[in-house]
Curated annotation (Swiss-Prot):
The keyword Transport applies. Its main location: periplasm. Keywords: Chaperone, Periplasm, Protein transport, Signal, Transport. InterPro entries: LolA/LolB/LppX, OM_lipoprot_carrier_LolA-like, OM_lipoprot_carrier_LolA_Pbac. Belongs to the LolA family. This is Outer-membrane lipoprotein carrier protein.
Length: 200
């Protein structure tokens, strides 16, 4: 009888975590708009910190986001729902690409879409509040994508792990569920900058 009681938590746990893909999607769907500040660390395969940075991010699902890096180098990533704009003031260049083509370069796009068709391309594993996504396509150049999402839908941190083991870690602070204004997801290239338009 004691054995049955000991086994019960294992059965319940198995049921709760039966489908990590659905659990991730369900949690993300609880918060369809948020803003936060972030801290970034790029860590080498050997564990050395290569780069540290800070910035802020604003998201409104589906497909709208503004990712503003303040340090070490100022740059801006904006999605207006169709086009992904990347602006680097230092080199005075803007790159434009279709958002649907940007997942390989910017895995964070997955969180802004929360699309079942996206998740189907990954093996999703769950450990508590942390989800690890590994591409099913063995020819993909993308490594693992690790994200921590609370049961309330709050995205707390995420990491992009390259195939060589280098890791980019992002930790969110001052998480707010306030719905952002629509105009912050628009972008017009400043006059005088070079435009690399990859949408053709």
């Amino acid at each position: 009888m004691i054995g049955l009681f000991l086994a019960a938590p294992l059965v319940l746990s198995s049921a709760v975590w039966a489908n990590p893909q659905q659990e991730l999607s369900s949690r993300l769907s609880l918060v369809n708009a948020f803003s936060a500040n972030f801290d970034q660390k790029v860590v080498s395969p050997e564990g050395d910190v290569l780069v540290e940075g800070k910035g802020d991010v604003t998201i409104k699902r589906p497909n709208l986001f503004r990712w503003n890096t303040v340090t070490p180098d100022e740059n801006l990533l904006v999605s207006d729902g169709k086009t992904l704009w990347y602006y680097s003031p230092f080199i005075e260049q803007v790159t434009a690409m279709w958002l649907k083509d940007a997942t390989e370069q910017t895995p964070f796009v997955l969180l802004t879409r929360n699309s079942a068709s996206d998740w189907d391309n990954y093996n999703v594993a769950q450990t508590s509040d942390t989800f690890t996504l590994t591409p099913k396509d063995t020819t993909s150049t993308m490594g693992k994508f690790v994200v921590t999402v609370a049961k309330t839908g709050e995205v707390r941190n995420f990491s992009v792990v390259e195939q060589d083991g280098q890791r980019s870690n992002f930790k969110f602070r001052q998480f707010s569920k306030q719905v952002p204004k629509a105009n912050i997801f628009t972008f017009t290239p400043p006059k005088g900058v070079e435009l690399d338009d990859q949408r053709n």
